[in-house]
Amino acid sequence: MPLSQTAMRFAGHVAYHEYEGPAFNRAERERLIADLGNRNAMILRNHGLLVCAPSIPQAFNLIYWLEQACKIQVDILSCNRPLHLPTTDVVEGTSEALSGMEITLDNEASTNPALKDGAQKAGSGYGLLEWPALLRALDRQDPSYRD
């Protein structure tokens, strides 16, 4: 539901898959692929979230913000008050605007030399600027994840 700007990023870009029990059935793979289609985010009903992305930073960003959108929706619905939904034009415009805001690190590296090495490795997309900072925080907290 487009109840927040965060959720509007995903408007029309989320697939859904019905819960089929624990994923032991290999035949479910084909149904998951079919349900996902050309989208990169999926809500597995009564189960959880699934995302696909060309890089780990992009996948992390996608799952993080999809989860935030879901949390906001749960919070709003738990208020048991009438919903105020934006118009379709606003939802579509916001979704389109946010879809076009992906960061290209090559462009960022031209103004911030510290990003040059990361830019060459990462490419472009959401999450690429945040990812090095998240790894530095993890290195400080518990560097054993690299082993």
Predicted segments with their positions:
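Glycine-rich flexible loops
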Residues: M1-D147
